[in-house]
Amino acid sequence: MLGIETTCDETAAAVVARDSDGKGRILSNVVRSQTDEHALYGGVVPEIAARAHVDMLDHLIDAAMREAGIDYADLNGVAAAAGPGLIGGVIVGLTTAKAIALVHDTPLIAVNHLEAHALTPRLTDAIDFPYCLFLASGGHTQIVAVAGVGDYVRLGTTVDDAMGEAFDKVAKMLGLPYPGGPQVEEAAQRGDAARFAFPRPMLGRSDANFSLSGLKTAVRNEIGRIAHVSAQDIADLCASFQAAVLESTADRLRVGLDLFKQRFGAPTALVAAGGVAANQAIRAALDDVAQQAGTRLIMPPPALCTDNGAMIAWAGLERLALGMIDGMDAAPRARWLLDANASVPGKFANTRAGF
């Protein structure tokens, strides 16, 4: 399966095989980040991202096919992320996949980008359904029950900022380079997490939702109180911010796991995916939560947590095995819920992230 990913600021292509025993093998996984193109602006510029996908995608597909050592005739299908994401990039990837499918008479699979993250652990580990997924990225923060391919139940979501978005915005406040998430993590290692008493959002609530905008505002206010922000101030602010995120996340996940057990029984695992899952401090916190819940933690390698083509190819293989094939009328989507039955969390007006 050829997989194509173009939903944000990574252009990626990969070839993944599925053996007769169901195990996956990554034959190639080529990713070209657009960090340099967007660094000047301190964030992703959709028009620049779309043009970069146009410029790079054909070359990356050629490289992925060469590295895999196969011809197009060897493919059982081509999968592309059809959303959710920046619509210009999504159109580039899906249109390219349709062309390949038409020319080489191979099945097309239009993959939900979030589903690809949700299924990635089955590419790297032997894991059965149902499992509990913590998906945290620049655009999404969700706790999801993964009951099967195409069968997802959202247990919790952010009601404002996504976790990766909050990390990036705090980095920007502090003048740290883009992308900000890794910069905050690195600075936090040198800081005093007890110096600033930031709020722990949503702590103790009976639902499993997240909220990060208030914490982000608290960081901004604290920065404003410091006359001259030093390197140590930056490190302490990052450490204190990250500590608040970790405590809040652990609490939200404990509630999410309880909700999972009430509906599905004990999960086969707690699984983490998305770019934020590459943060080592968050990984350690998730491990503690899993141990307390009496389940195992499964986290794909960092390179498979961030956006990549292998996860799209694997999701395509999972869907193809169940006969889930799409036609040429498959539409690109800027928004695409993973859980089709999800509703907006009650009592919150700002629900842009994840909806």
From Swiss-Prot:
Q: What class of enzyme is it?
A: transferase
Give the record's keywords alphabetically: Acyltransferase, Cytoplasm, Iron, Metal-binding, Transferase, tRNA processing
> Where in or outside the cell is it found?
Cytoplasm
What the entry lists under InterPro entries is as follows:
ATPase_NBD, Gcp-like_dom, KAE1/TsaD, Peptidase_M22_CS, TsaD
**Binding annotation for substrate:** 135-139, 168, 181, 279
Q: Which Enzyme Commission number(s) are on file for it?
A: 2.3.1.234
- Where does this protein chiefly localize? cytoplasm
- The entry's Fe cation-binding residues are 113, 117, 307
The terms describing its cellular component in GO are:
cytoplasm
Any single GO molecular-function term of the entry would be:
iron ion binding
Q: State its cofactor.
A: Fe(2+)
Catalyzed reactions: L-threonylcarbamoyladenylate + adenosine(37) in tRNA = N(6)-L-threonylcarbamoyladenosine(37) in tRNA + AMP + H(+)
SUPFAM superfamilies given for it?
A: Actin-like ATPase domain
Question: What does the entry give for GO biological process?
Answer: tRNA threonylcarbamoyladenosine modification
Q: Which PROSITE patterns match?
A: GLYCOPROTEASE (PS01016)
The cofactor remark states: Binds 1 Fe(2+) ion per subunit.
Entry function: Required for the formation of a threonylcarbamoyl group on adenosine at position 37 (t(6)A37) in tRNAs that read codons beginning with adenine. Is involved in the transfer of the threonylcarbamoyl moiety of threonylcarbamoyl-AMP (TC-AMP) to the N6 group of A37, together with TsaE and TsaB. TsaD likely plays a direct catalytic role in this reaction.
Return the similarity comment. Answer: Belongs to the KAE1 / TsaD family.
Q: Quote the protein name from its UniProt record.
A: tRNA N6-adenosine threonylcarbamoyltransferase
Q: Tell me what organism the protein belongs to.
A: Bradyrhizobium sp. (strain BTAi1 / ATCC BAA-1182)
Gene designation: tsaD
